[in-house]
Amino acid sequence: MDGNSLLSVPSNLESSRMYDVLEPQQGRGCGSSGSGPGNSITACKKVLRSNSLLESTDYWLQNQRMPCQIGFVEDKSENCASVCFVNLDVNKDECSTEHLQQKLVNVSPDLPKLISSMNVQQPKENEIVVLSGLASGNLQADFEVSQCPWLPDICLVQCARGNRPNSTNCIIFEINKFLIGLELVQERQLHLETNILKLEDDTNCSLSSIEEDFLTASEHLEEESEVDESRNDYENINVSANVLESKQLKGATQVEWNCNKEKWLYALEDKYINKYPTPLIKTERSPENLTKNTALQSLDPSAKPSQWKREAVGNGRQATHYYHSEAFKGQMEKSQALYIPKDAYFSMMDKDVPSACAVAEQRSNLNPGDHEDTRNALPPRQDGEVTTGKYATNLAESVLQDAFIRLSQSQSTLPQESAVSVSVGSSLLPSCYSTKDTVVSRSWNELPKIVVVQSPDGSDAAPQPGISSWPEMEVSVETSSILSGENSSRQPQSALEVALACAATVIGTISSPQATERLKMEQVVSNFPPGSSGALQTQAPQGLKEPSINEYSFPSALCGMTQVASAVAVCGLGEREEVTCSVAPSGSLPPAAEASEAMPPLCGLASMELGKEAIAKGLLKEAALVLTRPNTYSSIGDFLDSMNRRIMETASKSQTLCSENVVRNELAHTLSNVILRHSIDEVHHKNMIIDPNDNRHSSEILDTLMESTNQLLLDVICFTFKKMSHIVRLGECPAVLSKETIRRRETEPSCQPSDPGASQAWTKATESSSSSPLSNSHNTSLVINNLVDGMYSKQDKGGVRPGLFKNPTLQSQLSRSHRVPDSSTATTSSKEIYLKGIAGEDTKSPHHSENECRASSEGQRSPTVSQSRSGSQEAEESIHPNTQEKYNCATSRINEVQVNLSLLGDDLLLPAQSTLQTKHPDIYCITDFAEELADTVVSMATEIAAICLDNSSGKQPWFCAWKRGSEFLMTPNVPCRSLKRKKESQGSGTAVRKHKPPRLSEIKRKTDEHPELKEKLMNRVVDESMNLEDVPDSVNLFANEVAAKIMNLTEFSMVDGMWQAQGYPRNRLLSGDRWSRLKASSCESIPEEDSEARAYVNSLGLMSTLSQPVSRASSVSKQSSCESITDEFSRFMVNQMENEGRGFELLLDYYAGKNASSILNSAMQQACRKSDHLSVRPSCPSKQSSTESITEEFYRYMLRDIERDSRESASSRRSSQDWTAGLLSPSLRSPVCHRQSSMPDSRSPCSRLTVNVPIKANSLDGFAQNCPQDFLSVQPVSSASSSGLCKSDSCLYRRGGTDHITNMLIHETWASSIEALMRKNKIIVDDAEEADTEPVSGGSPSQAEKCANRLAASRMCSGPTLLVQESLDCPRKDSVTECKQPPVSSLSKTASLTNHSPLDSKKETSSCQDPVPINHKRRSLCSREVPLIQIETDQREACAGEPEPFLSKSSLLEEAEGHSNDKNIPDVVRGGDTAVSACQIHSDSLDTRDVPEAEASTEARAPDEAPNPPSSSEESTGSWTQLANEEDNPDDTSSFLQLSERSMSNGNSSATSSLGIMDLDIYQESMPSSPMINELVEEKKILKGQSESTEAPASGPPTGTASPQRSLLVINFDLEPECPDAELRATLQWIAASELGIPTIYFKKSQENRIEKFLDVVQLVHRKSWKVGDIFHAVVQYCKMHEEQKDGRLSLFDWLLELG
């Protein structure tokens, strides 16, 4: 429910497709919208996620939905919901021109304002802003839409194509945007239809939608009765709100109304939350909104006060109503306060109501009186303040937008408290009260300092004290929010919120210094009364910050920026810590804090952290710029502009988590450690006498420490920037500086600052503290903790954030440190531990002590603190006696850390896994775990590789410790990830030698030169690893496991033999060992495999993909496994992955492909090795892309070789069969891996190892997408392998579990390749074919069938990779799916088939003849009958009839595939394989799952088959059974193609195996576009008869797609008519509508001036029985052709008609 609940029309599809972000801009510029009182304008920004299934070209190419009807309306669309896609693209920046304005006004009077409010952030290509509830403009009038009770949802679309008119990526983006718009309209329409279609009901509709959202949330709560109650309450609230809205909103903007409604929703949610603490995702979302609103308000108190005020007022009203409805009299009063946010808040503050609320209110409404006035004058004021206000708003939005998105993403994972905290913003005051009463009542009283009620709406959720306090903190002061908020909530969300609040505050201060100052003053005043020194202090810092802001001194602004940056960094980095650290300055908060700690949020996803880090980075950059170049900005406006831009850029830019280089990290760590140590020492010396356990003392210590640290950091920053300015001016680096830097680096590495990010955070925090000294030690400690935590978190990238500071810092630091330096140092080197402990722990201990003190003050926390204290004290003591004292305060935290450490292991060397587990499970992120695991795996692999490469060279790899001692080995293992990033930082001696592992080139050279060396080393490693198993040490055990996984011990002999026999150094080592691992256990092997594969993949796919000057693509053999695994390379890979950011899927894809290819290679080699009949050529020049690592030539060679050998030796067959069985033994994988279907298929009785063409690795994308579908998750292995998940798989891991990925990869690869190969073999072998045919037709088990059965059995043994698959005919499906997924291989296969079809059409036919057997096959999954894909001889003949086209196509494909040679054999084999696959697919397709697999094949053929799909049978039929029936009529169906197509249609799931955009391009390249389409068209014509039935449905509402959904009227509105390709857009909208199952979409005749042609095209499509996939393919081909400027740039319709 990311942000869907925020949408008036939530969409599940949307949620899966994109992140919904309710735009704070909702209310912007809508004041004068003049829409009816009942109307509400809802703005929702949807961000398309690149990983979504609908973004995969595969999906669309294989889409078998029937195209919907196209209609044209002249003047009215009576029952049509309408959607207007406004294309904001303009060649010239005319957005501000009257002309464009007028155009927008034509659409809706509200539009220009909304758009201008969004102008600062033009929607990106992957974003669409959905506006609903706009007043209708002339556009509607043209349609006489007045007849339509509802207004069209206006979708603002930034044409994704931009200047790259027709790239596939853009096309898919466009389709997805249209999907979103159409889907929203559909949903809205449904809502409207459910309500009376009256204007007044429009409001009801929104309310109902909100209600629905709420209901959805409640479903999550699973409190039906409660939900009903809430619903009723909510309705009441809505009603009252409506009334109020009618009255007040008439004064206020409609937007406000919307905001209010949403706020109500939030309030309701909050209420619900109050009733049921259960976390509401929605609630979380609402907090986001609240936060946004609040943040916005904070951002520009003076600029947007009116707006905020309105919102606040509205929120207050809403809250009030809500509370009334709730019958919370007290809350009502509070709501009233909210209602009059300014006054209420003030009064509340006076009352000692959570000062946070008061502060928030103040912040929102700097001047209560003004607020009131402002409220009234809001619209005018808004206009007056438009410039600054808008700017501030935009800035705030830009700053907060991504953060909110992240928040929304992360919040769902938050514990209920977190959720509450999120919503706290809304219900802060009321909830504060209730919360205060419940959990934090005393803390509220005690902690008025928590002033985070940014928007009263948030208050609703505030019920949970921690949460409310948390948001309040955010609002009131960055620092204070961090401190107090963290104290109370420390929810990860809180952390982010705090950061956001800080950012908002900063922005607000910058934009309206006076207001900020006032607010600050008020906050200080209000905070003080509560008596929460922390709050006062917090506010004081703000005051410090803001007073200067009065005259807007850049220093103060920068200070604020720095604070924000540090807060963001801390939040992003230490979000978990924050949660854990929810150290309420006062005792009351601690409970909440503890609770939050108890439920550390699962947040801290890389993306969130990245975003926060990015924001912090942007802020820091601005600060640096200002300090360095004071004259850079001529005015505050410039500065704000730059600030806004920077923040937007950094926030929007995809970040890489591990991008920091080790040196820089270490330097940063060192600096931070030095600074912290220095500060701590200073404080320690100052307070040596003071009892560290004394809370006051600890507070003082914390304050002192914070001041010292802040001062240090500020000085550092100032000096640095000063020197920087010199450098900038002089253009050279002062020698002194250089020396200093070098010296510092030399010195500090010993300290090994935990994390550059941390140091940065510290620096920032310190700077902010320095600039705005935190009078509040709590604040300081919080900041420090946050910073520390942030540093650590950053270091870990969300490794451990359990306690913000208390545990999290220690934990994260320890875990990070442990993992990194600390882990090794802690156990390994007392010195390092000492240093680091002093630096890190000491640093932490003060923080901890602060926290502890705070905790003590909080009381509740103290127990926890004390608990952790004992453990951590010892460590502390061991670390540093003095530190220990500090630790006494921090002890609790430290102890917790210690506890964590103890969990980690006394040595802190526990495997990363242990560390992860140690970390708060909730807090510990999957990402962290995956990262750690990946690091561990990579480091292990690297170690092994290094050992193998050169254990004896004297360069002992850091992991040489294998034998030597668990501590060393463990050290590397534990921090494997850290090691990866900073091997040098490893405390353990050898571990420190990050450079020891041989260079890639070195390794490669050595391995190539001395394969025996590798073998020898590997053997030694194996032996050593075996010995290691004896070590009881958990670390050793873990290392041992890793080693064993990396190379399954049982498989070593095979691996060794393979290595010895093979000249394939890389494949031998990597794949052999991977393969063995794979065999050992899919689960266990998977993680290592993943890491290695990832490295492997990265080395190949990434390098080639990333245009790395690496010739790895040429041939896998060129890569030595060692090389791919070296730490260096692993780091590179990880960095690549991280850098890729959005390319994650691609990388994963490559990774999967590489994985599969490596597995296949190793398996093949081993198999060949075992068979003794095939020797794999170590290297083959490769035409194939690196993703296919094994080149086509190599495959062909192998095929020939294998075939020849297999013919020659039966024993080899036996062995190969055994081998294949072994390979299959791991659990089946989702089709994802199919692309690598190069595995020899031992199934065939001949057990010839025929290798399918490697399929593009892009299927992983699909796999990733599939993951969400439960295929992957079904696999039991997933949990186990997830532990071994590589970081690179983190996203996959999240999605479906790495295990699934690996399983899928392996199994898919094996199954697909093996089955396909076997099938091919069968096909190749007449006997086998006959046997296959017999089983199909006769059902008698032929050898082929037996093979298939064996394969199936092996698969089943391996464990149904996917339960779904099992049900679907796992074996077939796997292969099919695999086939499906690799479009290239599919294409090649298809080509083969196509070529083969004519060649082997009979065979195919015979094999395919038994469609029923195919169905049976389904059943026979168990029976293992191998239904052959019955490719009708007629169809085959037809194909033969079109042999040239097919052949040409095939040849083209093959050529593209690099299959050109051996067409007959490979093709036949492939074809046979494909046929087999198809058969399997049939059987599978019966499962539907297989169908997708078939689709995969089809996908390859997608262009050709796309035409076939109609013939394949109505997509609706999509079942193999039907296909089988059709196939019964050989004439009617080209079964294989049909199957493929059908599978395509069936297998939207199969579509999930997306090629990925890149792949699609490649795919297109591989397939001749026009010929393919022509072929397809021909094929379709052939199939046309079959598809006639389909055509009929096409003419009517598509049977398959037909849905209760009503038709939609699509209005396209272009600011610049010549901009978009109207035909292309209409076609894409057609595709989108078809995908949504909309029976008919109407276009405005006046808009589609080429109606005739459009209708002709529609006719053509229906006549050809094209499916959506065919249309899409044609569009893609057209775009490709268009890009190539072919065909004289025919218009799309002309081109399609010509094609037809």
Swiss-Prot record:
Keywords assigned: Cytoplasm, Phosphoprotein
Basic and acidic residues bias: start-end ranges:
839-855
Please provide, in alphabetical order, the Gene Ontology terms of the cellular component aspect for this entry. cytoplasm; mitochondrion
Its domain of life reads Eukaryota
List where Low complexity composition bias occurs: 768-778
Query: Where is the protein situated, by its record's location annotation?
Result: Cytoplasm
Q: Region PKA-RII subunit binding domain: list its residue ranges.
A: 929-946
Signal peptide coordinates:
none
Cross-referenced InterPro entries: AKAP_110_C (IPR018292), SPHK1-interactor_AKAP_110 (IPR008382)
Where Phosphoserine occurs, residue numbers?
A: S1025, S1085, S1107, S1120, S1121, S1124, S1259, S1288
Q: Where is this region: Disordered?
A: 364-385, 742-778, 793-885, 980-1006, 1374-1414, 1481-1535, 1585-1604
Q: Which GO terms describe its molecular function?
A: protein kinase A binding
* Expression (tissue specificity): Highly expressed in heart. Both isoforms abundantly expressed in ventricle. Also expressed in spleen, ovary and brain.
Biased composition range(s): Polar residues? 822-831, 857-873, 1383-1398, 1586-1604
Family, as annotated: Belongs to the AKAP110 family.
How it assembles, according to the record, is: Interacts (via the PKA-RII subunit binding domain) with the RI subunit of PKA. Interacts with SPHK1; the interaction greatly reduces SPHK1 activity.
Query: What does the record's free text say on domains?
Result: RII-binding site, predicted to form an amphipathic helix, could participate in protein-protein interactions with a complementary surface on the R-subunit dimer.
Its annotated function is as follows: Anchoring protein that binds preferentially to the type I regulatory subunit of c-AMP-dependent protein kinase (PKA type I) and targets it to distinct subcellular compartments. May act as a converging factor linking cAMP and sphingosine signaling pathways. Plays a regulatory role in the modulation of SPHK1.
According to UniProt, the name of this protein is: A-kinase anchor protein SPHKAP
The organism of origin for this protein: Homo sapiens
